[in-house]
Amino acid sequence: MPTYVCAVPPKFLSDDQKNQIAAAISHRHGEATGAPSFFVQVVIEESWSARRYLGAEPADHHIWIRGDIRAGRPQEVRGRLMLSIMKDVSAIAKVREESIWVYLCNLEPTDMVEYGHVLPPPGKEQEWFESLPASLQAYLKGLGAKKETFRL
């Protein structure tokens, strides 16, 4: 359900760091919202053509994270989520916390289709999951079962 896009300079992160960041963001989202890990998509983009600037100076040691998430969660939950992602990514990437930018964009669940179905509002995941075809439920359980923290 959430999609987090991390924009990083090319060759800034190792493959292991990218894997750790994806795991950390997935974990933090689930921890904050209760959403199962198979809902969390993390994209790490390295672009040779994109140049980012701050104050007209190249910003070569910054990481930008944009999370498109379902609307309906309190500001307190969103604030904790952003700060925990910032701290985790800072530690993994070995950059200052001030170099991590996190933006959450709240989308209405009815404006999102994933796995072929319009998404439920927060707190209605179980009913949504139970309404899915058995084959899709099995597929999603398989994704979540790869993590020790799987729950629905």
What would you call each of these model-derived segments?
Residues 1-152:
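A domain-level signal for the structural core that forms small-molecule/cofactor-binding pockets
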